[in-house]
């Protein structure tokens, strides 16, 4: 790409325009928070806002939900393709929630798309989308565990007018009222989205009145060009190479299978290609995603790893190609159901690309670029929908947004964030417990960090959360659950371990009310009753007044060999209640005595023994690299666990960063030069006190540990599936 030559004055003005447009998009979000009346918007921040140019190219977005980038672009373009210029009029607004036409992440994500006119000329579009509590279909709350097709899931709107010339279309409003279970609340949410779009139009018109329509178009396009140029330069810091990996979506709502998602990342000259050939065909369960949703989820690690300091707009997309085979779980066609797709397959896409991009960044010659590599977020949204009727016969639906409390992936300089939420939804918040209790018929017993859930590493994965509630003021109800990351844990990086996984318990016929009558709130260990583990996906599980519903969320992946973690930090983690003594000892090799002090000599001996045990149990390397490390010269690091060294002929080799043991030449798979220890995931992580759901039949999930044959350091930990 030819470098853009722009005067300083124009650059300054372009930035002023960019900031003003970004501020308008953020103001749209503020309006939604203040007017929707729903905790899922005001507390959980489950929405996004965008502004696009007249052709549907993204100008700016508010940053709330990064995975909405694909659906926003697709929705506007679908409307442009299906309506003539004469049919799109000032004052109009379109409603869209159909994954198969307007690429909604799932039907409960309802978008309002508004054309913006200046002097009767179409100049831009605004888009406001948020999660609506119910959209009809077979399951209250919109997560249709038992659906076999899209027809069962929801009343879907493919970008049709809900506002015509400034007035609500009564027929559409009436259609919503008779099909959605909470019509008054649903309509109020949609009105708040419309209000946000109306406000954006007023502010953009004011901006054009100030600067003129020609300057508006000029600086909108210039900002796209500047972002494109900056991004292509960033890509040029990565090796020209292809990286390949696989992830697995779990349990499609009907069968507990594993569904392969495969991606090949090719780094070209200022260009990235993500090729998803090798991904399985779409399924009749609700874990499929639309092409637009797949793109939105794929863009998340791109934005947060490679463009964290580059304004996001259409310019970024010009440097990326997505190859998404139609009829697969990553580009589903009618009639595939999709209501859990974004939170299962979509987040697997995000995790897989986080790993592939981090691999490329670790091999960069630029130290700053290498420093942005990271482990995977837990990236699951363990959804819980509690529904029923209150004492007056009115229906309630609690879409518990505490699902956004899973742990973040470790970074190259710090632990992962606790209760970070999902990588694709970083602006999500955890709802205020009191607000939930005021709005819905539940009483929370606790909400706390989930001990031992973060993946062990030199830098620990962030912890997830653990919470419990009981029905309150109602004669019970039913619970629909659906979580990803139940059996396949989120991978660590550079020798860090995967994080723990997520799930649900119900304690049936508990003694909770005995404590309540005494004015006490019981903790988990005090509760008696029958403890029942729920499936990852289940619809309509009965919850009675004496039952306690418990949800626990896993952590992010760790980074670096946990034996490299400072024992004092391990001790602090134990004192803070983040980990148990078992985790400290088995994962980190730190011995803590009965007085809460580190046993220094015992710790040193234990760490030596752990490395020796790795070497003893690990399988012999597939290939041996027959070079003398002493004859090699250090060139650069390649992440926490590896270094690149060079011989006198200029040939480069991948070596262990600890002992500099040569593993392979730079163009070969260095893992073939490492010892390998393959263990079923529940056993591999369970020895640390972590939780991973075991699979009762093949394929089984394994943790694959790659160990330096020279010193026993942990170089890399992957996951795989197999028969035995």
Where are the model-predicted features located?
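Short Cys/His-rich Zn2+-coordinating modules
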Residues: 631-651, 684-695
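Short, cysteine/histidine-rich loop/knuckle motifs that typically chelate Zn2+
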Residues: 657-658, 708-710
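Flanking scaffold residues of small Cys/His-coordinated metal-binding clusters
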Residues: 650-651, 700-703
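Extended intrinsically disordered, low-complexity coil regions enriched in Ser, Thr, Gly, Ala
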Residues: 649-685, 719-724
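Acidic, low-complexity intrinsically disordered segments
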Residues: 715-716
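Fe(II)/2-oxoglutarate
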Residues: 615-642, 654-656, 660-663
